[in-house]
Amino acid sequence: MTNANNMARYGVGFDYRDGEGQDWIGSWHRPDISSPNGERHGSSGVCLTSDGDIVLVGGDNIPWEFPDGRPEGEEDWWATLEGEVFEVSCSSVEEATLRGFIRIECVRLPQKGLVRIRSLWEAMVSVHPWVPQHEITRRLVVPSYEALERVEFGRVLGPIYRRWFHEATGYVDTNPL
């Protein structure tokens, strides 16, 4: 669930350090304007089943997360979403709505100035038999109210993920974090 007081607002940046020690500023961007400038870094989906449950994926050393992936060649945002959701969760995207973008900019060497953009979607999916591939070795289908409790997205970028989850599901938690 999400807390209205802890959701990202348009264009407001959040400082964070990634697992490789790089310092970044991440921000939420609305879908009703063109995507922010930067390197296309993939698509992610809050994937809902016809029952309203949510598909999560993970690996041996990968915590639960929403299905996502990077583009191959010149794929557009939609093609990346569709292909990666199938590859990592064995689910077919039936329809999808763009809910926003996350923009991250590296603010310290050696990658200072690098800007990456990821599209964030709400996707209605059909779940197929599980055939794990690559680094994704686990899939879990959970009620929507459990999804954010299981996904590890870090405290700093949490407001962006909560905004995306709210935009995709409509859930708002009135309890503070």
Task: List the model feature ranges, each with a label.
Residues V46, L120-E122, R139:
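Conserved hydrophobic/aromatic beta-strand scaffold that supports enzyme active sites
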Residues I102-P129:
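Active-site-adjacent beta-strand/loop module that shapes the phosphate/pyrophosphate-binding cleft
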Residues Y16-G19, T49, G59, L109:
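Acidic surface patches and DE-rich sequence motifs
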Residues W130-L177:
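Nudix hydrolase/Nudix homology domain
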Residues G26-H29, S34-S35, E105-R108, V115, ...:
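Class I (Rossmann-like) S-adenosyl-L-methionine-dependent methyltransferase catalytic domain
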Residues S92-F101:
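A short coil-to-beta-strand element that immediately follows conserved catalytic motifs
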Residues T2-S44:
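Acidic, metal-coordinating catalytic segment for phosphate/diphosphate chemistry
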Residues L48-S91:
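Conserved Nudix-box catalytic region and its N-terminal flanking loop in Nudix hydrolases
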